[in-house]
């Protein structure tokens, strides 16, 4: 939506249906726009009708050559508020947008209910002489100027993602527009307005803010009648990103009318897990002595939720009083319901991680690390959902199966921990696809690995239990990166090893002939089963399997190809060829794998380990650029001598057809897979109850 000003269109957006309006105002300088609020909008829009705008000069607003003075910017703001706001509103102003907020608060006190100043300021100045020290540098070195600026805005360790985002957003304007915007606001000072601000005001500011010094904030707050100051020890200017959880909650509480006193927030490295739980923690009513578990399960692939359901059932067998609520997005929530288990109502509020990963996917290709790297706003939104759940109700245990959001934000905010916490994963270490230390992916992997190592070093009591779903030897024997620990040695120090977990017992399956009859396969036919998990990335592999099968079908007349698309791959082509069957989601796929004469799969851990345990011959195609499938899973399968690895790009339908013929029904001689991992994982978790 746009407001049309005499010289520019100003973009605004409304999110949420709350009864109260909340306006998030980015800074005046055009180095950012409304995207800077990506960690705030999804959460706050559950409570408010959230309004944002892109200031002239960046984002989806126009970029006129002039009009960047304070008065014109103020007129832009008023025009948007007049167009869309429902007074009285709560106004959140970041950085140099604060002078606009002060002007509006003084001119229209009846239209504001609350004012929040995030790293706010009342005056602005730029280095002089302007042309030499500012304009020329921006024109001649725009890229490096942006990088230097945002390194100052995010001085905290492990801030690379925030720096990268802001450098990108600043690059969406032009050097000339940026120069003009800086020139136009140089020398502004609205200190004389502060004493006339009558709206309840809250300031959030970091002591290490290198853009607006903390002393500036103290003077500003002292001049505003009744204003309160929340101090972030060692916090920088970019609190909206680095302290998103706390910023979100302070904004929520204050805008809803709660009083927030002057508060000092400890630096991240100094924060601690509360022990014992504070009296203010929510207390649940007695429920026949039930012990309640909140289980956050990654929906990226179905392996996580399948093993989690199996472990949960085994946990209840050992502890009948345990009740488990699952927080798991699509398609994992469908599996939970199919098993007849409890899906927490807040699941509907989760942002869809699977859809995000599919957005990074191409034909049999998934840049898994890049998808994880770019999932930060989803992680924030989903952690805020979980934080609200445990704020309202008490659980006796939290479990996160590759719940990267829960794990990251608990280490950043350990004081929010209210129950024992167990972390599960089936791999350790993020890996770049090529060992080029200058590449962006290598640097990002190092950053995230270093952050994870630092988290566990600084806050060893956040996790009460870390389980690797596998064995010590499954961890790669290599460093996380330069100057970082060896992965396997680090895992020995921080993890317990459950062995691989299965959601079924291969030993309990019927004899093969009976199983085939039960599943509708004739005893005299040869069954090739191709399955691609729970996402749409596998369409290309299914298509290639169908093409290969048509080439060899005449050589094996008593044969059938079954293509399993998964719950998110439903629009499969109808006519693949003779003796080709297409199926949607198959809940007990493992039974079909056990009955098959050959399986063809991607390189996902769950499916390949099931096939190894079932001793079914299989061909596997790791997704291109998927570090976990290409390296971590391949390590396990190599150790077992299981499966035949093929490369999707270099395997033609003819070559795949030849492999089908060679391995169809071929005896398997891989090492045996231990089958007690589910029991071991359940026993380890039970120790926390």
Regions found by a protein language model. Give the residues of each.
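Conserved nucleotide-sugar phosphate-binding/catalytic loop shared by glycosyltransferases and other
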Residues: 318, 322-373
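Donor-nucleotide binding loops and adjacent catalytic segments primarily
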Residues: 499-598, 649
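A nucleotide-sugar donor-handling region in carbohydrate enzymes
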Residues: 432-435, 440-536, 566-568
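Active-site loop/oxyanion-hole signature of alpha/beta-hydrolase fold enzymes
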Residues: 36-38, 42, 52-92, 249
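Conserved alpha/beta-hydrolase catalytic His-Asp/Glu region
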Residues: 125-128, 140-195
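Conserved HGGG/HGGXW glycine-rich cap/lid loop of the alpha/beta-hydrolase fold
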Residues: 6-60
């Amino acid at each position: 939506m746009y407001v049309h000003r005499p010289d520019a269109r100003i973009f605004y957006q409304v999110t949420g249906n709350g009864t109260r309006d909340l306006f998030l105002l980015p800074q005046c300088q055009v180095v950012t726009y409304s995207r800077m609020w990506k960690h705030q909008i999804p959460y706050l829009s559950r409570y408010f009708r959230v309004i944002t705008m892109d200031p002239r000069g960046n984002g989806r607003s126009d970029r006129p050559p002039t009009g960047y003075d304070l008065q014109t910017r103020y007129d832009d703001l008023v025009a948007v508020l007049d167009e869309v706001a429902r007074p009285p509103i709560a106004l959140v102003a970041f950085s140099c947008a604060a002078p606009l907020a002060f002007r509006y608060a003084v001119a229209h006190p009846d239209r504001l209910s609350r004012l929040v100043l995030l790293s706010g300021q009342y005056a602005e100045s730029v280095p002089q002489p302007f042309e030499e020290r500012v304009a020329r540098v921006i024109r001649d070195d725009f890229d490096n100027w942006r990088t230097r600026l945002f390194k100052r805005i995010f001085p905290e360790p492990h801030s690379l993602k925030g720096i990268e985002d802001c450098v990108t957003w600043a690059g969406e304007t032009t050097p000339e527009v940026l120069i003009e915007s800086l020139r136009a606001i140089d020398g502004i000072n609205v200190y004389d307005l502060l004493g006339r601000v009558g709206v309840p005001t809250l300031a959030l500011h970091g002591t290490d803010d290198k853009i607006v010094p903390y002393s500036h904030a103290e003077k500003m707050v002292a001049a505003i009648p009744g204003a309160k100051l929340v101090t972030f020890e060692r916090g920088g200017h970019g609190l909206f990103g680095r302290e998103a959880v706390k910023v979100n909650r302070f904004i929520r509480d204050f805008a809803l009318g709660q009083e927030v006193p002057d508060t000092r927030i400890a630096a991240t490295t100094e924060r601690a897990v509360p022990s014992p739980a504070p009296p203010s923690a929510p207390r649940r009513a007695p429920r026949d002595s039930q012990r309640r578990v909140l289980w956050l399960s990654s929906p990226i692939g179905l392996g996580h939720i399948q093993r989690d359901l199996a472990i949960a059932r085994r946990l209840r067998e050992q502890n009948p009083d345990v009740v488990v609520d699952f927080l798991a997005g699509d398609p994992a929530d469908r599996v939970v319901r199919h098993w007849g288990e409890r899906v927490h109502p807040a699941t509907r509020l989760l942002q869809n991680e699977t859809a995000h990963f599919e957005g990074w996917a191409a034909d049999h290709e998934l840049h898994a690390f890049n998808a994880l790297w770019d999932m930060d706003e989803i992680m924030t939104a989903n952690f805020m959902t979980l934080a609200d759940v445990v704020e309202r109700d008490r659980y006796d245990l939290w479990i996160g199966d590759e719940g990267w959001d829960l794990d990251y934000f608990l280490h950043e905010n350990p004081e929010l921990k209210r129950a024992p916490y167990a972390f599960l994963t089936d791999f350790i270490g993020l890996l770049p696809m090529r060992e080029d230390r200058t590449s962006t992916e290598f640097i990002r992997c190092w950053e995230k690995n270093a952050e994870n190592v630092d988290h566990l070093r600084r806050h060893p009591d956040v996790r009460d239990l870390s389980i690797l779903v596998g064995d010590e030897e499954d961890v790669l024997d290599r460093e996380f990166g330069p100057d970082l620990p060896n992965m396997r040695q680090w895992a020995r120090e921080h993890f317990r090893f459950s062995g691989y977990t299965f959601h079924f017992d291969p030993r309990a399956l019927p004899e093969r002939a009976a199983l085939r009859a039960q599943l509708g396969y004739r005893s005299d036919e040869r069954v090739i089963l191709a399955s691609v998990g729970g996402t749409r990335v596998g369409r290309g592999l299914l298509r290639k399997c169908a093409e290969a099968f048509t080439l060899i079908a005449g050589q094996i007349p008593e044969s059938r190809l079954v293509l399993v698309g998964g719950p998110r791959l439903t629009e499969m082509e109808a006519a693949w060829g003779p003796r080709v069957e297409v199926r949607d989601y198959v809940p007990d796929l493992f039974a079909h794998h056990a009955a098959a004469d050959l399986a063809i799969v991607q390189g996902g851990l769950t499916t390949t380990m099931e096939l190894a345990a079932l001793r079914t011959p299989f061909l596997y195609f790791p997704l291109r650029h998927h570090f976990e499938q290409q390296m971590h899973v391949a390590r396990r399968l190599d150790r077992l001598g299981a499966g035949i690895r093929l490369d999707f790009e270099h395997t033609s339908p003819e070559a795949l057809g030849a492999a089908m013929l060679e391995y169809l029904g071929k005896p398997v001689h891989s090492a045996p897979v231990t089958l007690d991992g589910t029991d071991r994982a359940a026993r380890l978790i039970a120790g926390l109850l």
